[in-house]
């Protein structure tokens, strides 16, 4: 999957690194966030390790359960949390990397990416209640790193490519159920990612770097060549639709959650836009290439807050250590 180093070491021995948020990757909690930015822990006292490289949470269609990627000594697995303060159960048990969960439209199964076959990331599905064995849903030549589906689940919208921080190779493609040949949806010489279909399946929102930075775009679906609209103008990542289809939420270049009001009954039109709250100031996680949060039917956001419940919002710091190798050698000689 996509992962990014938090440090760099030069040949001359200078070390540069980000300190991260107080509490580290092993301390995080699931929270509800209102449109005004009020943060409330889902289950006070419950903390978990979301993993150092990426976080992911997906809300079930009925809003009663959350699928969360949790990193333990056993590996990165998908767990299911009963909301709000209900039990937590482990869903996947393979030592491979199980990531980026999505719910089936009927809420009975969870779809996720996994490298457990050893040939890159494939798409897997497993009953959400833990019964039955997981099975491969799609095994393509390219790595599958994201998925979404329209309401009738007749097609897969997939993001292919882009491992280890590569740029310009992330593409969105469509694959009809039962077919083996993908068709390009947004596959141009820059990165297209974070695919999000509208609740009625008529519109595809995604982020693209075609202007030189990530912005949010919308195209008709599945006939993507019949139009294209730019939703954001000050940077945009992680598009998510409101469950009524009347808003697109995304995080702008300043790290603020933005609500764009849209009309898609006839053609598509953005009729308004307003920032809601700062994601960065509240230590709320967001993925660079996919939406790592979700939206409930009542308009609240289900997000992961890093640093734990006692964290006071200590920001990341960039630290430069000169002659780091010499210091290490000196300590080893002691």
Model-derived regions, located:
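Conserved beta-propeller blade repeats
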Residues: 1-18, 45-69, 93-115, 139-162, ...
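Beta-propeller blade-edge and WD-like acidic-aromatic loop motif
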Residues: 14, 22-41, 65, 69-90, ...
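Active-site and glycan-interaction determinants of carbohydrate-active enzymes
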Residues: 304
């Amino acid at each position: 999957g996509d992962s990014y180093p938090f440090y760099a070491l030069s040949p001359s021995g200078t070390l540069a690194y980000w300190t991260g948020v107080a509490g580290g990757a092993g301390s995080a909690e699931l929270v509800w966030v209102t449109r005004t930015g009020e943060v409330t822990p889902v289950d006070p006292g419950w903390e978990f390790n979301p993993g150092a490289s990426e976080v992911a949470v997906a809300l079930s269609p009925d809003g009663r359960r959350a699928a969360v990627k949790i990193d333990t000594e056993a590996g990165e697995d998908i767990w299911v949390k009963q909301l709000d303060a209900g039990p937590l159960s482990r869903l996947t048990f393979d030592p491979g990397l199980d990531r980026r969960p999505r719910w089936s439209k009927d809420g009975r199964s969870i779809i996720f990416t996994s490298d457990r076959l050893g040939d890159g990331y494939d798409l897997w599905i497993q009953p959400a209640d833990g019964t039955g064995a997981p099975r491969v849903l799609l095994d393509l030549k390219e790595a599958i790193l994201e998925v979404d589906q329209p309401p009738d689940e007749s097609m897969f919208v997939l993001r292919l490519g882009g491992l280890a921080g590569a740029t310009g190779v992330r593409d969105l493609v469509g694959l009809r159920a039962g077919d083996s040949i993908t068709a390009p949806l947004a596959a141009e010489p820059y990165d297209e990612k974070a695919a999000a279909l509208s609740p009625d399946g008529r519109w595809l929102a995604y982020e693209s770097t075609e202007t030189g930075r990530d912005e949010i775009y919308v195209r008709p679906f599945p006939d993507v060549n019949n139009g294209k609209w730019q939703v954001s103008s000050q940077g945009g990542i992680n598009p998510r639709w409101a469950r009524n289809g009347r808003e697109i939420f995304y995080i702008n270049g300043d790290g603020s959650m933005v609500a764009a009001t849209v009309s898609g009954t006839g053609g598509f039109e953005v009729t308004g836009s307003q920032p809601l709250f700062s994601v960065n100031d509240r230590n709320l996680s967001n993925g660079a290439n996919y939406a790592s949060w979700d939206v409930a039917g009542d308009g609240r956001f289900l997000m992961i807050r890093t640093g734990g419940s006692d964290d006071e919002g200590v920001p990341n710091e960039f630290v430069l250590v000169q002659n780091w190798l010499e210091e290490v050698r000196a300590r080893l000689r002691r």
